[in-house]
């Protein structure tokens, strides 16, 4: 503390943090009681500004490249000290939190923020433990200083802002960024590196459980339906975005949800709608003159968000954990309109589609992305967050599926009857009916039809779903054009998969080019 006039606020409650955020002009209260905050020009993740410190302990285990960019250890130390000095004469907010709802696999983390609303976000998204760090593990530190401006020539950064992970020192530095999602994703990347060494598969997925204790996982990129489909009024939510799958069960890595708000409606997403109340942080959501949120307004960004603790969800699994999954769903948003709404996958096909991660960037979470929708291949359905080589995660997935006997499904939440702009997107009720059939076990032994070009088996009938939708060629008026698009998609899969060194049994499990 430089001159004694600044304060360090430790482990403040939700009410205290909201009060201080308002008093400091960091945000406004909305009509539904949530705190709305704006993040400025960076309204999404900044992948070009994310680095990992290159040090002997982790260097050989990280897949260095455009996602995991190296940062010099000496430069990190200098920048950390510089940011620490910057915060020394300012009020700061500190909480002792945990990442991972598993007694064995949690990581304790001390979160220091310059803004009160960032601390509220951290307490909503991470786990607020009854007893901090009961197992007395070494503590991670997050330091978040959004008003600090990096100088690339001096600091070795890419721009005026940065996110840097240091595994040797257990530190995460965020500087120059107001977008709060960087905090949660940085600790997800940390767990994605640490968990595989313990035989645990970290996953970019949501999870829920039924009355009988049956767990279902939903993998997918942002905007493909993870949060929406796991928030099922008939089931109990474990979590909406990040989980670990250990021998014996799955656990949430987080203690809250970070739901997309664009076009949110009470009718289609009642669980999320009801969770947005006092204590929730709304990020970049526009409000009207009466402070009523306008969820259809994307003036600031398509990537509007609500961050709330799991306590805001009535139907949730109280311990944030579940049994191993009977059903695993890969959510893909196919902009070409070629893929069927649901396919059953073999273990090898599961590994192939997990590594491929074919989907679309829908209302992308990355800074600078516009509303334009484009197809993409994102390894493990979350390429930006996985530090180790992809094969490590695919191998763990196959191991877990095989040892427990989980059934994997590929579900298309994208287009049918033509590509984006011509066809129409599967509506949420149709996808929910498919998911209901998956979780009930209806599709486990259902009769299927083989689609040769796509090398996929699709059910011939599903309760509550128009059978015409199940084989995509039936929804296209121009069958020749469908064949053309299917060929193009198959070729794209093959071209993308060439980079993977995997057994032929997995290589042969994809579409037939």
From Swiss-Prot:
InterPro entries: PEP_carboxykinase_ATP (IPR001272), PEP_carboxykinase_C (IPR013035), PEP_carboxykinase_N (IPR008210), PEPCK_ATP_CS (IPR015994). Its EC number is 4.1.1.49. Binds 1 Mn(2+) ion per subunit. ATP binds at residues 185, 204, 220-228, 269, 305, 431. This is Phosphoenolpyruvate carboxykinase (ATP). One of its GO terms (molecular function) is phosphoenolpyruvate carboxykinase (ATP) activity. The gene is pckA. GO terms for biological process: gluconeogenesis. Pathway: Carbohydrate biosynthesis; gluconeogenesis. It is found in: Cytoplasm. It comes from the Bacteria. Belongs to the phosphoenolpyruvate carboxykinase (ATP) family. PROSITE patterns: PEPCK_ATP. Pfam families: PEPCK_ATP (PF01293). Substrate binds at residues 45, 179, 185, 305. Keywords: ATP-binding, Cytoplasm, Decarboxylase, Gluconeogenesis, Lyase, Manganese, Metal-binding, Nucleotide-binding. GO terms for cellular component: cytosol.
């Amino acid at each position: 503390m430089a001159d004694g006039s600044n304060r360090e606020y430790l482990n403040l409650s939700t009410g205290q943090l909201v009060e201080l955020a308002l008093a400091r002009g960091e945000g406004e209260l909305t009509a539904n009681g949530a705190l709305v905050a704006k993040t400025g020009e960076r309204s999404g993740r900044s992948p070009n500004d994310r680095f990992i410190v290159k040090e002997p302990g982790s260097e050989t285990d990280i897949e260095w490249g455009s996602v995991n960019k190296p940062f010099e250890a000496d430069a990190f130390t200098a920048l950390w000290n510089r940011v620490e000095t910057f915060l020394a004469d300012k009020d700061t907010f500190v909480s002792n939190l945990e990442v991972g709802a598993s007694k064995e696999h949690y990581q304790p983390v001390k979160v220091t923020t310059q803004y009160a609303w960032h601390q509220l976000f951290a307490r909503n998204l991470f786990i607020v433990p009854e007893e901090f760090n009961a197992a007395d593990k070494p503590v991670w530190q997050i330091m978040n200083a959004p008003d600090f401006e990096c100088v690339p020539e001096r600091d070795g950064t890419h721009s005026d802002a940065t996110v840097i992970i240091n595994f040797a020192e257990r530190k995460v530095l965020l500087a120059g960024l107001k977008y709060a999602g960087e905090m949660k994703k940085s600790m997800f990347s940390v767990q994605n590196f640490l968990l595989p060494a313990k035989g645990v598969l970290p996953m970019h997925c949501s999870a829920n459980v039924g009355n009988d204790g049956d767990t279902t996982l939903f993998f997918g990129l942002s905007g493909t339906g993870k949060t929406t489909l796991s928030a099922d009024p008939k089931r109990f939510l474990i979590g909406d975005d990040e989980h670990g799958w250990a021998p014996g069960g799955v656990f949430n890595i987080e203690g809250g949800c970070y739901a997309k708000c664009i076009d949110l409606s009470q009718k289609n997403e009642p669980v999320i709608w009801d969770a947005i109340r006092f204590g929730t942080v709304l990020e970049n959501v526009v409000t009207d003159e009466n402070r009523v949120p306008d969820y259809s307004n994307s003036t600031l960004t398509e990537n509007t968000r609500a961050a709330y603790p799991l306590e805001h969800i009535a139907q949730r699994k109280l311990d944030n954990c579940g049994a191993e999954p009977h059903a695993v769903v890969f959510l893909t948003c196919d902009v070409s309109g070629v893929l069927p709404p649901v396919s059953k996958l073999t273990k090898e096909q599961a590994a192939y589609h997990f590594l491929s991660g074919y989907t679309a960037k829908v209302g992308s979470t990355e800074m600078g992305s516009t509303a334009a929708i484009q197809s993409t291949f994102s390894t493990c359905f979350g390429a930006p967050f996985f530090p180790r080589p992809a094969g490590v995660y695919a191998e763990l997935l196959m191991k877990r599926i095989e040892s427990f006997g989980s059934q994997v499904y590929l579900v298309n939440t994208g287009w049918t009857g033509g590509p984006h702009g011509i066809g129409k997107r599967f509506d949420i009720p149709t996808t929910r009916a498919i998911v209901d059939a998956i979780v009930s076990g209806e599709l486990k032994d259902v009769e299927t039809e083989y689609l040769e070009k796509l090398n996929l088996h699709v059910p011939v009938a599903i309760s509550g779903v128009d059978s015409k939708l199940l084989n995509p060629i039936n929804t296209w008026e121009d069958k020749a054009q469908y064949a053309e698009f299917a060929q193009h998609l198959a070729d794209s899969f093959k071209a993308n998969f060439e980079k993977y060194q995997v057994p032929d049994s997995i290589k042969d499990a994809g579409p037939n080019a």
